[in-house]
Amino acid sequence: MKKINLYEENDFNELHMKRFLVHDSPYFKILNFNFKAGQELPVHSHDMEGQVSIMVFEGKGEFLSKDSTMPARKGDVLISEISEPHGVRAKTDMRVLVTIAPPI
């Protein structure tokens, strides 16, 4: 068992989103991405079976897909097949927690 405080472990970078590997196992991976306003994780996909969840735990922005956007704010969770194009854009400073199963 382990405990991690994401507010202490991962901060922000003025030039690009900041990534922190929270957990990696044969079963799932957890990542924390911190974005300054205007930064983004570009739309992308992975050629494999599995699912991804993106949970906003601070800030506001947009969940991105190939052809559209959806508002994203604190408490929102996007769940998608990992092969479906997905991304995130921050409108304010924003922290998200991404879970990938199985891990890539």
Segment roles from a protein language model:
Residues 57-58, 73-74, 92:
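A cytosolic small-molecule/anion-sensing beta-strand core signal
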